């Protein structure tokens, strides 16, 4: 066995660090996840809430770890350990990881002004807008939060957690320092605070936005949830806090914190607040208000929507004031900030020849957040005599108690509600939907259940009137859908763009060699070809956009990324077909279906006219051809005949679900394609 040594819980960790530095290289990093470390790094193994990293020591060694630092609970446990690389045990390491990581990275937060924001809703908007305001003034600022990590030079890295694990936190802060950051704005989640992910971080300024129901699957009670949030305000070294005194928790904090405090309020009753906003005016393009600090006031014209976002801006104003900004400087910066990705984000249509509804994507996934967003959009919709649509679901393996509450909020404030899926994770989507509809009035005519989220989005975008507003709530910036232990590409904004482009009635084409100018190219992958290789060619041919699995930013062509494009084509064809209340005849069979389809097409043409009936052309009768045919449907069509072919089991069921025929004709069933019927 290689070198092994146990450090008692009362031993200074500096001795461990010195021993490690003598073993590993100067660029070695600490990692708590064996999957992320690189050769020469140090694996820090502690038990977690669900798993235990100590069971992955061998995986870390196989990945090239140079040393192991292990949480140890007893001497006997340590005596049973062995490894082929240097290993160090630390009693109660789990409670000292923050201290260890801080020392390893040479106290990065001591050289930074770290600003942390906590609260149920608004954390992401606050830290992003704080960073935007600071960048306007040329301040080198980094961000850590739900949207990932952004360094002062603009480089970004994805993040799995709102608040990264404690080792990743200190490693990231060290990288921020190395890249020249002066200020780091971070989101402090309740779970992150409860699990000590900010341990060892020197936080200078902390802010509280609000508290409402969320994460009770983890905290179990609102009291425990609140207590986790309040841990942020017990950090040693705090120099100032910013509090929302429209929230009872903010009022409580204002009475107990012992550092300089700035309070903010939107309520007219809260005359004692340090910062307030008056004369709010919101339209589809933004919100104007008067920002006041007691007797001093400045006007602010912003691009953000809603009173709840004005409250978030007040929080940002409080933090900027604590950083030494004048009120006028704050107001000027607010005019230059832009909406945060996935937070009341308007999806701008690629084309606008035909008027389209206003589509908004928002991360609202709690009853309170959904209500705030819907109230904002409801007012805008009412001002133009339009309807408000709400497409939403609830996440699996999360607080089930909020599902019915969100259903009730949606039905109360939206004119049309589409209940769907939102990261079902390990739960059955139908079971989650069943929980949601408990909160809906029975027999509600304004509610549609569509479990498939892509279909739900397409239905709302395609069915809404041009003056309407369509809210896609719950996923916001997320570019995935998580189900059954897998994450697949899924972006609400991209599916909304697909619906908006369909409304323009562009031709959807898959052959780059024959593409018409003004068409939308759908890139397919086959055994011997990849349509994504021809994006530059179709751009030169005049394509207005391309539907792709993943955007290629090197090509100067607008792209709509929908993941698997074959599956997306079926989705688009199905959704578009649903927009037409006309008779459709489906023809299938082993032999004679094309001849039968042509005879029916001739009869239909004689009945309603050639241009008023749609029929399958050529051999477009499979999982590619059928949706492409359905996407040719136009308002002038009165009837259609669609040929359905099959060369593998289950294909007819798929095509029938897409076509949704009123009349089905099966010619015969013979022994065809036996090589595929297995």
Question: Positions of the model-derived regions?
Answer:
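N-terminal leader/targeting and accessory segments in enzymes
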Residues: 1-99, 103, 248, 276-281, ...
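Short, conserved loop/helix-junction motifs that constitute active-site signature segments
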Residues: 62-63, 80-82, 199-202, 232-237, ...
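Acidic, Mg2+-coordinating active-site environments of NTP-dependent enzymes
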Residues: 71-80, 179-181, 194, 203-358, ...
